[in-house]
Swiss-Prot record:
Motif PIP-box per record, residues: 271-277
Known cofactor(s): Zn(2+)
Native organism: Xenopus tropicalis
GO CC, one annotated term: chromatin
Record's protein name: DNA-dependent metalloprotease SPRTN
Motif, SHP-box: chain positions: 231-239
Amino acid sequence: MQLSVVDPTWELLDPNPDIRALFLEFNDTFFWGQLSGIEVKWSARMTLCAGVCSYEGRGGLCSIRLSEPLLKLRPRKDLVQTLLHEMIHALLFVTHNNKDHDSHGPEFCKHMERINKRTGANISVYHNFHDEVDEYRKHWWLCNGPCQKRKPYFGYVKRAMNRAPSSLDPWWADHQRTCGGEFVKIKEPENYSQKRKRNNDPTKSELGNSSHVKINKGKSNGVDIRTVIPFSGTGYKLFEPSKSDAQLKIQNDNPTKDKAVMHHTPPSTNQTDSTFLSRKIVSAKKISVANTKVFINLNGSPIKLPSSSNNKSHQDSSKQKSVLHFFKTQKDNSIDLTSSSQSFPSTSQGPNREETEHFYKKLQMDDKESKDTFIIHSLNKTNVSDSLNNKSCAGPAATINSGLNHTKVCCPVCGTEIFESKINDHLDTCLQNYNT
């Protein structure tokens, strides 16, 4: 035997039912599935009535809200009857477009009696929850005018929210015309004014937040790993210069001090060279791979071009248009080397002549290797010209046409006409003879 929807046994089987599940079951059983698009939910702030059916827009949107404060302590039977009452309103809205909340006419009574006979429920026109409604009316006002002696309210206004009577109420104009008294608040929840002052006071709220933060900071959720494994590295703060940068800045600000230190160093060329190279490495800036004067794009990979002996030769090589112009600057480079030797720190005795000649010969050999590499790179550059951009390839290399392999070219060193395919071997021989 199937239990009725208001059977007392449900108080033990399902005391706190899911309103959405109840709604779907009642929709299929009593309303022919016509309310599938209607929303049903709890309302935590509604205290004047147990339930309400809201109509939204012109597209047939409707929602049912049930009062959680009024129904949470009531028997399950009251929840079921209230839900069925609001579902009848929703059915009239869906079928007859009836949006009147207070309309309990013949059509409403017909569905109400049909469901009552079928289920044994007692769905009524109005919900009789006056005691619960009055329980939530904590804010009272009393009029000091003649309406104190009039029935049925005797000048009292009781509300669940702290909103004094005003012109927003529909009965305000009639009260001003017949009574004209003022409403004075006579009752409110315990400690309500103190809580309100505490919430409105910004200083106390800030103090409360700070104390709360301190309490949270005092809580230990676990052991800090820094107490177990100490940090042994070197830390750097953001926006703080490192020690090496600070030392470089001090050295740049005091050039006389650097000269004094260099003057008192022992006469060792190796130590001087290492000091010069270390300073050059520290002060050098990182060159971007987008710089076409230093890097070229070869099959998608950046390749660094060979650098010359000094900045002057590098600037000249970046502007040259022929290999002949490259070798014309060799004598100028030798002059620059002799002039640059004067910039090295002088000593009381000076280095030996053999060491000096060995040093210059080493520089010339390095310069020769860089020039040979540069020439070979410029001759082989035409093989990958399709993968290079014309603008990015406008570097120190000279453009050579690879289609003229059987033509003769003039050697830039000795002036002899040589086949272009044998120019590399001939240049190696000429360079060796030229340096010796």
